[in-house]
Amino acid sequence: MEQSQGNIANSPPTSEIPQRPIILSPPPLDQNSLNQSFNNLPTSVPQGHANRQQSVGYNLQHEFETLTANLDLDLNSSTRNITQSAPPNQQQQQQSQLQATDSQLLTTTADLNTKPAHSVKPTLAAPAASRYGSHLGSDLLGKSTSSLLGDNNPVSPIQKFSSINTQLDSLLNNNISSAKSKTGTNSPFLSNAGLSNRPQSVNDFSNIFNRQDQQQQQQSQTFSSFTTQQQSQNQNQNQNQSNFYSDLIVFSNWIENLNPQDNLTMIDYLCSNLPLDILLTFKSKLDLHLQGGSAQNQQSQQSQLLPQFVMSPYSQYDQQLYNDMDKLNIQDDSFKSKHGNSSFRSNHLANLIDKVERPKSADPFVNNTKYGQYQQQSYNQHSYQQQHPLVDRAKSPTSHLYEKTNFLQLAAANSNNTGGNYNQYMPSLSSTSSSLGQANSNNTSTRDDMDLKLGALATINSRVALDSNRKHPHVATPGSTWNNQTHTHSHISPPHHNQMHSGVRNVSNFEESINRSLNSSSVPASMHKSNYSNSHGNNSNNNSGNTNINSNQNKGTHKKKINSPTSAVSMQQNSTSVNSTTSGNGGANANVNTTATTSSSSSSSMPIEVSSLELLNNIPAWLKLLRLHKYTECLKDVPWKELIELDNDQLESKGVAALGARRKLLKAFDVVKNNLPVV
């Protein structure tokens, strides 16, 4: 506190400090003016006042002055006091305006008298632009903006700039003269309608409303001139169209009068000089014209629908594509069949030439075996069905197994095993067997393997059928029932009735042989012939000798057939052989022989087909009959005459390791030796 009081005491009195004007802003950038302002001050100013730190206001003033320099603002006029922040008084402002208008009038009158009208370059620059020198239009504002400075405002000063680029000056002069000729006015300045509405300078706010009126007047003038120009263009277009067609006529007549050499020269010239789209259009038009009138009419319709794409080469491609699609027709000649018209088509019948061959799997015998079995005996079957209705196979729950097994056996058969008698009663399968035989003969290396595979499948089906036949005996063995019926009714039947029953027995025996082969151990289809031939050959003796067999023996054989379906045919053949002996020797021998053959056949379950010559010639099929096809590889190369002479040790050396298989083979060998086939 004492120091502060001492400082106040030592400070000079306020009366000694002279009064100076209050400065609201920091001193300007100009150092000379700053020195003058400090020189005017008395010497009693404290030291260090001139070198004081620049304040924030001083920095703002510096930025403001640089901004005014960039915006071309005249803030440094000579009439202003540098240290004075307030605007000048009214007298100074009026004097400066009078001096500016006098100088402007003098310069404009001098320029108009000395130079032509088109050489004057108007400008929109503010009066402050004069301080930047004579190169404002070319250097500072640039060449592109110097042409936009024209204005017919009488208040704005018209200054004369000496541009560096003389070519740009001549271009501006030409633009002024052309604008003058178009607008029809005598003013040497550019029209305001072609200029953008450019904002005025900062200090020039005078006569802005009059300028808008002038722009509206010039716009109305240009609109009226545009309407008149449009009318004249329409008239010229009509004249040009008439001239165009007349020129086309003259050009076509000129082409017609040219010689061939000149025509070639003209075409070469046009092809080398015309644009590509015109050449493509001409090519498409020429192709459509050469194709005919219908295509040309379609082309004209499409060109009327799409007039904007006429000259486009892509539209021509599209039109060609559409034309080709329109030509596509279902009844086109290129898609018709090449077969000639047949006489069957006129009668709406199936044409046998065009008919596709039916597949072999669609054979009626495969799905309906009754058709193939009875087509030769249809009359006898019909007469017998009226008295004794047959049991239909379709009632059996395993009816599909018969068809499957029969089909697999037919596929396993080769060409050597196709018999004529079998095809006689199965004509629907004769073509199938022959075609399969041809295929097997062409493929001899894999024939046996295919037979084994198909036979194995047939074995599975036959075993299932055997189990089903044990459950349904009345369905499985219809032949035995029919034989019993014929045996019981043979005593009272008249001769003509016996003849009818003989035909029915032929059918029943054949059906029995089919069932026997289907339910056995995969017997190939060739065995049907031997089965039927044996049964058919013995039927002649049945007519005379079946009356001597009593009903008790028939009942016994019927039970054995049910229990053992595999021995059904052998029992039947034994009975028929007994009948043949009873016709010559008497009834006593018949009873003895019947019991002997019955006991012998019942003791051995070996099928009688093992002695068939055709099976013996085909060892794989013979082994399949015995259900020993697993030893096919061991025994297939041994002839049957040597095979039946083998003993137990030789079979074991051949590869038959199972004792049961060797015993079964030895039994089969004995059967073959007892019933040697006739070679």
UniProtKB/Swiss-Prot annotation:
SMART domains: SAM (SM00454). InterPro entries: SAM, SAM/pointed_sf, SMAUG/VTS1_RNA-bind, VTS1_SAM. GO terms for molecular function: mRNA binding; nucleotide binding. Pfam families: SAM_2. Its main location: cytoplasm. Signal peptide: none annotated. Residues 90-100, 214-239, 530-554, 574-604 have a biased composition (Low complexity). Residues 614-675 form the SAM domain. Residues 1-50, 79-100, 179-239, 469-502, 516-604 are annotated as: Disordered. GO terms for cellular component: cytosol; P-body. Residues 1-17, 30-50, 79-89, 179-213, 563-573 have a biased composition (Polar residues). GO terms for biological process: nuclear-transcribed mRNA poly(A) tail shortening; protein transport; single-species biofilm formation. Keywords: Cytoplasm, Nucleotide-binding, Protein transport, RNA-binding, Transport. It is found in: Cytoplasm, Cytosol; Cytoplasm, P-body. Monomer. Binds to RNA. Belongs to the VTS1 family. RNA-binding protein involved in post-transcriptional regulation through transcript degradation. This is RNA-binding protein VTS1. It comes from Candida albicans (strain SC5314 / ATCC MYA-2876). The lineage of its organism: Eukaryota, Fungi, Dikarya, Ascomycota, Saccharomycotina. The gene is VTS1.
